[in-house]
């Protein structure tokens, strides 16, 4: 019933986009209409309405976030292309996501263009931290219900090892109060496990040696700062890792027995290997979230 209620309210609001667009055109002429591109219903309604009521308007969809192999909504089939409302141009945050959309979606050749990461300019201001070995580990969670599974995974892997201090950073959508009852342990009874007090992300990252994640985009910031990352694959049907095609300064594990070994491998990494891996990882992130420049901004001009 809750799903039905949410769906009903959502679809009503999205259908209103048609009338918003139509009424707006009574007052202004729209040369170019730019919106986010996540293949949401309301976006399609906007594109369809503009083609109906203002055929001369150019439409741009901005792919503004990460794209994983689990982002099925972003991968259009040949059959869908024949009838699905689409923007005239899709602009991406960088070359990596452009490549993912082209590889897994059946977009026309000239539809997708790589640009820059408008929402992630801050990432270029993050300072590289020294490679530290303080046995402190940050676990970054997403804002989805299943995020508690990662905490349980880490606990089952490290609860017997008191040498490591594990800090859990929750997502604003799923604060610790919402996941506590789903955990397999009482965090107050384990001194080596604690919850971040939601200090700025860069501070949490700076104070830890390693990041453990499932699908969190915090992994991109971590690599930019030179923090090794460990991706936990929680029996995923499809890959939710935003760094699926990056193997630099990154370890991927699938069972609890592998986590202590991965952590040891990180700490045993020679300094020259770390620097080499960091440079390759940073290069990957810079292609994923490309820097804002005048040339790249010109992709928003039709």
Regions found by a protein language model. Give the residues of each.
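Catalytic binding pocket for nucleotide-activated donors in carbohydrate/polymer assembly enzymes
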Residues: 102-114, 183, 217-287
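C-terminal alpha-helical cap of glycosyltransferases
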Residues: 286-302
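Active-site and donor-binding regions of nucleotide-sugar-utilizing enzymes
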Residues: 1-121, 219
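Conserved catalytic-core segment of nucleotide-activated headgroup transferases in glycan assembly
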Residues: 107, 112-184
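Short, aromatic/basic amphipathic alpha-helical patches
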Residues: 45-51, 104-105, 154, 178-189, ...
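Short, charged/polar "capping" segments at the starts of alpha-helices
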Residues: 42-43, 68-71, 97-101, 122-123, ...
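Structural motif
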Residues: 31-32, 89, 136, 165, ...
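Donor nucleotide-activated moiety binding/catalytic core segment of transferases
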Residues: 174-225, 229
């Amino acid at each position: 019933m809750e799903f039905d209620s949410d769906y009903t309210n959502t679809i009503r609001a999205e259908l209103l986009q048609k009338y918003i667009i139509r009424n707006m055109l009574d007052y202004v002429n729209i040369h170019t209409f730019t919106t986010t591109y996540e293949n949401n219903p309301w976006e399609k309604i906007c594109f369809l309405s503009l083609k109906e009521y203002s055929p001369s308007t150019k439409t741009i969809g901005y792919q503004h976030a990460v794209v994983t192999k689990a982002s099925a909504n972003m991968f259009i089939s040949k059959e869908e292309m024949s009838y699905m409302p689409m923007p005239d141009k899709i602009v991406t945050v960088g070359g990596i996501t452009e490549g993912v959309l082209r590889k897994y979606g059946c977009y026309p050749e000239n539809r997708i263009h790589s640009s820059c990461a408008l929402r992630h300019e801050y990432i270029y201001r993050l300072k590289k931290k020294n490679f530290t070995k303080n046995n402190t580990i940050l676990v970054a969670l997403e804002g989805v219900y299943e995020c508690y599974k990662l905490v349980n995974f880490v606990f089952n892997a490290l609860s017997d090892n008191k040498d490591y201090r594990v800090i859990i950073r929750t997502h604003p959508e799923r604060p610790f109060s919402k996941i506590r009852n789903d955990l397999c342990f009482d965090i107050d009874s384990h001194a080596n496990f604690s919850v971040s007090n939601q200090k700025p992300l860069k501070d949490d990252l700076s104070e830890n040696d390693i990041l453990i994640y499932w699908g969190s985009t915090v992994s991109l910031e971590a690599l930019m700062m030179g923090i090794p990352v460990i991706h936990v694959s929680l029996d995923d049907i499809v890959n939710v890792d935003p760094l699926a095609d990056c193997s630099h300064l990154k370890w991927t594990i699938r069972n609890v027995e592998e986590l202590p070994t991965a952590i040891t491998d990180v700490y045993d990494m020679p300094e020259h290997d770390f620097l080499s891996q960091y440079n390759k990882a940073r290069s990957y992130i810079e292609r994923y979230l490309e820097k804002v420049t005048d040339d790249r901004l010109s992709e928003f001009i039709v």
